[in-house]
């Protein structure tokens, strides 16, 4: 058991919690909590830490997880935890590098490739019709995490983000995805307008959620390849991005509401596409 914050592993772990640049260089991110750790593909867990009280209270969970863990005293675990109320388990997880093809659903998922699922059950793998959510300068970690969860539930193929959007590997984002971050492909682009034009050139119709949209969102056809553009929480889509869209759409609202939360708007659009594709 590690009982000192002066331990080399603990010093490294504390640095990883505080410095995103270090996490980027290592190609890893941190995950806390038993529910989230359960969601991690086992081959991606680089190192696992548990508190002494967690070990004492959860022997069955630890056995079932089947991953060797380093035990920390409760005090040391609290020192390296990112949360006010530590849940007693923390994992260092290897990142996956996705491509645009992954986001468009044109290749086997990275999880399939890693586990060999595609080879074992080729009939379960199929190229999917693109259903993409495009995020322009999204800044709120909670919103991004919610969009990940919703995208998975609505059947989206992936998420495209401008390079100035919040970091997917921000600990708050990771927590709020509730595990979807391990399964939903995503890709950052430096030139979002060019990326939107590229989607259109590939036959993927792009729809910008916009207050000036002339078309009502549920009157469009999303059964073919589609991408929904969602803007910054306070400012919406930048003009140079919305101008590249094939169509500006709006979500009708009652009362005095001027706009919807970015994650809510994304959910409305993605689930409408999912509904149409289930027919």
Predicted features along the sequence, with ranges:
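Amphipathic alpha-helical repeat scaffolds
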Residues: 33, 139-146, 260-265
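Structured adenosyl-cofactor binding patch, chiefly the S-adenosyl-L-methionine
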Residues: 150-154, 168, 173-181, 239-279
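N-terminal positively charged helical leader segments and presequences
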Residues: 1-84, 112, 116-119, 125-126
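Short amphipathic alpha-helix with an adjacent loop that forms part of the alpha/beta core around
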Residues: 101-108, 195-201, 218-221
